[in-house]
Amino acid sequence: MANILQKSIAAILLSGAILFPCTSHAMDWNDYDESPHYAPTAMHQGYYQVDLVDTLSIDEYAPPIYVLSVNSFLVSPDGTTKNIGRTTYKLNYETKEAWLLTLKKPEWFPITTATTSSRDLFNKLFMKAFGIPFIAN
């Protein structure tokens, strides 16, 4: 059942149901970059938006899983080139686990939350989406 949910989330993301809200520049999938370093770099530059993806849970007592789609502009150092990218994370607030969606298979790839950079990234995303940090210091 989890595999069906993963594939349906990936299908929604690929179908364009969650689009980058920029009317002057259409999404170009040739510019897509699913690197886990893409969203943090764009976030550092200040060009990003966090969208919460609705998820379904079969077990009402299971800890909530949050799926965040991060749409971002990545600007080159000279300020002339802009690329559009999207990175999708799945976060378990209770267990502090995180995953990155890879669209080639599609599947969720686990990401460590033990490093300072990953804690900063997930805290910033969770603050933007919910107003609270993902991992308290």
How would you label these PLM feature ranges?
Residues 11-19:
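Bacterial N-terminal signal peptides
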Residues 1-12:
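Bacterial N-terminal signal peptides that target proteins for export
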Residues 21-23:
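N-terminal signal peptide c-region/cleavage motif recognized by signal peptidases
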Residues 25-86, 92-137:
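N-terminal secretory-pathway/extracellular module detecting exported/lumenal segments
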